[in-house]
Curated annotation (Swiss-Prot):
Cellular-component GO terms for this entry: small ribosomal subunit
Domain of life, source organism: Bacteria
InterPro entries: Ribosomal_uS7, Ribosomal_uS7_bac/org-type, Ribosomal_uS7_CS, Ribosomal_uS7_dom, Ribosomal_uS7_dom_sf
HAMAP family membership: Ribosomal_uS7_B (MF_00480_B)
Family per similarity comment: Belongs to the universal ribosomal protein uS7 family.
UniProt xrefs under PROSITE patterns: RIBOSOMAL_S7
Subunit structure, as described in the record: Part of the 30S ribosomal subunit. Contacts proteins S9 and S11.
Organism: Oceanobacillus iheyensis (strain DSM 14371 / CIP 107618 / JCM 11309 / KCTC 3954 / HTE831)
Gene: rpsG
One biological process term in Gene Ontology: translation
Annotated TM spans: none
Protein name: Small ribosomal subunit protein uS7
SUPFAM superfamilies: Ribosomal protein S7
The entry's keywords: Ribonucleoprotein, Ribosomal protein, RNA-binding, rRNA-binding, tRNA-binding
KW tRNA-binding (keyword) present: yes
């Protein structure tokens, strides 16, 4: 805990091309070693591929993918009487978004396609169709929360 009170949240600026803060946060998630230009290029090319393959607006497909990937529940470890319990808790809206973006980018990196643009585009398309590794990760989180529902009364 900082002594000087809570640290203020930094607000991200909306993306110049898509006018969306969510897109800026995705660019920040893709970015490695501060190379924002490269991350933007990857995302914009991926969005072009998404629009081409789906025949829809890339932004709408991405928003649908985010809805399908963002977890509602997660489990957190809580120590009670010498043993650790996995306690299911609801995920705050901002964390839901952060986790969704992280899952999409991380599982894109693990895919087998040649370029990051293709991997990201395919992961977004898969997520919008409720398939893919990122959606599976969310389902696994929900299953864990469901399995540990008995410990819900340990919430804090």
């Amino acid at each position: 805990m900082p002594r000087k009170g809570p640290v203020p949240k930094r607000d991200v600026l909306p993306d110049p091309l898509y006018k969306s803060k969510l897109v800026t946060r995705l660019i920040n998630q893709i970015m490695v070693d501060g190379k924002r230009g490269k991350a933007q290029k990857i995302l914009y090319n991926a969005f072009e591929l998404v629009a081409e393959r789906s025949g829809q607006n890339a932004m709408e497909v991405f928003e649908q993918a985010m809805k399908n990937v963002m977890p509602v529940l997660e489990v957190r470890a809580r120590r009670v009487g010498g043993s650790n319990y996995q306690v299911p808790v609801e995920v705050r809206p901002e964390r839901r978004q952060a986790l969704g973006l992280r899952y999409i980018v991380n599982y894109s990196r693990l895919r087998g396609e040649k370029t990051m643009e293709e991997r990201l585009a395919n992961e977004i398309l898969d997520a919008s169709n409720n398939t893919g590794a990122a959606v599976k990760r969310r389902e696994d989180m929900h299953k864990m929360a469901e399995a540990n529902k008995a410990f819900a009364h340990y919430r804090w």
